[in-house]
C-alpha cells in the first residue's frame, strides 16, 4: 500500500498551561525523582522552589509564556519495507535529476542524527532509500512516487532536484517555505524543508511571532541574576536566535542552581536565519569539590524532562562543562506573548 501525502485530520489542541504552571510542574517532577538526602520537609522545599520559579526564573513580569501542546503535523505514515525501493533500483529512475551520492549520503546522515524520531519525512524514492539505509524506519517515510503525490501529512520534505522539479514553485510557495538544513550546491543541492500544515502565510507569520517571543525571553534571561552568559553567547539571546526549548529549560534550570551559558551552537548546515540555535554548552558557577557534583545534578535535571523539553542528547564534556542539543525541527508557538 502506498501513501501519497493525504492531509490528515487536525488534532485538537489541549488548553495551554501558564508559564508559572510549567516551571512549577518541571521542578516538582524533578524533585520527586531526586529527593534531597538527609533533609526533612522536602515537600515544603519543593513548594518553595517552585513558587520561587515564578519570580526568579520567569522570563519577566508582563510577559506571559505558555507551553503549546506540540503535536506532529501528521500521524506516522505506515508503509511496508518493500514499499521503499533499494538504492540501486532508485538510481536508475532518478538519473541526472538525482542528487550526487555524496550529497544524498550527507543529507541522510544529518536527518538520521538530528531530526526528531517522531518526525515523518517526505522524500523521493532514492532519498527514502538512503534514509532507510541510515536507520530511519519505513513507517517514518512518505514516498513521493507520482506527480499526484504531495508532502502534506509529513513534518519535513527532502527537496532533491527530483522533488523540486516535481513541485516547482509550489514547493516553497505552498508546502514548505523554510529551509532548516541544506547540502551541496547547484542542481544537485538537497534542502531539508519544514512543512507548513496551515499554509505558507500562516507559517511565516508564526515564524515572525516566534522570533519576537524569543527576543523577549532571551532578554529576560540576560537579566536573570542566576544566569551568567559568556560574551559570545549574549548576542544570540538578545536577537532571538536561541531555540525556545533551550530558553525555557535554562530558566527552569537556573531556579535549581546558578548556571553559566558558555555558548550556543548551530548543528544545521546551510540553515536560514529563521532557524534558531538548538544546542548549548553549559557550566556550573560552583567551584572546587562542588563543581562536578553540581554539573551532574544539572545533567540529571535536563535528562529528567519530558517532551518537548527532553533533548535529543545531553552529556558531560569535562568535569566543568556539559552540552545539550534539541532535535530538529524546533516547535513554533512554544513561547507566546500577551
Report the location of each language-model feature.
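Short, polar loop motifs at secondary-structure junctions
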Residues: 124-129, 161-165
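Secretory targeting and sorting signals
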Residues: 45-69
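C-terminal region of N-terminal signal peptides and the immediate post-cleavage residues
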Residues: 60-88
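Loop/turn elements at helix/coil->beta-strand transitions in domains of secreted/extracellular proteins
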Residues: 115-120, 152-154
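Extracytoplasmic
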Residues: 125-154
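Glycine-rich phosphate-binding "P-loop"
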Residues: 79-103
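Terminal targeting segments of Actinobacterial cell-envelope proteins
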Residues: 1-47
